[in-house]
């Protein structure tokens, strides 16, 4: 796993070690979750030729600054910011891996974040929505 930062976003990169990478899956987790809850899915995707690139959404996982910020995206325009975070990650990933197909897996709240991106006509190859 690589860990990069984009402003205050922690970007987790779980890269497949298979000889032929098939695409990239961006995981958008649910409320009160974090990317660590998806290790089983990340492992399965990596073993099947997919890179996984994700973040803990604002107020979740490693992005909790204090107990008061748990689950809080921002004091203003939080939803727009969390949607923009994911869009920025996907846009940057397209530049880094221009030939690979991009997919989003969104669970619960994460599925609504993914749908918000879909409304903006985000250029991705597919989307899986869970618990929507």
Predicted feature residues:
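N-terminal cap/lid segment of alpha/beta-hydrolase-fold proteins
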Residues: 1-17
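Proline/glycine-enriched tight loop/beta-turn segments at coil->beta junctions
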Residues: 17-24, 50
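Active-site glycine-rich loops that stabilize anionic/oxyanionic intermediates
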Residues: 27-33
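Conserved alpha/beta-hydrolase
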Residues: 42-68
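Alpha/beta-hydrolase active-site loop
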Residues: 74-94
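Alpha/beta-hydrolase fold nucleophile elbow
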Residues: 97-108
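Short glycine-enriched nucleophile-adjacent loop
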Residues: 111-121
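Active-site nucleophile loop of the alpha/beta-hydrolase fold
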Residues: 128-132
């Amino acid at each position: 796993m690589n860990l990069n930062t984009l402003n205050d976003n922690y970007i987790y990169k779980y890269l497949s070690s298979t000889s032929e990478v098939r695409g990239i899956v961006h995981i958008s987790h649910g409320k009160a979750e974090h990317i660590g809850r998806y290790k089983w899915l990340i492992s399965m995707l990596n073993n099947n030729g997919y890179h996984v690139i994700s973040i803990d959404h604002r107020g979740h996982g490693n992005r909790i600054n204090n107990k008061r910020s748990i689950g809080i995206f921002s004091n203003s325009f939080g939803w727009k910011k969390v949607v923009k975070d994911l869009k920025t990650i996907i846009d940057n990933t397209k530049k880094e891996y221009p030939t690979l197909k991009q997919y989003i897996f969104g669970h619960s709240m994460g599925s609504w974040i993914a749908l918000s991106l879909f409304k903006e006509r985000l250029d991705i190859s597919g989307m899986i929505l869970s618990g929507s």
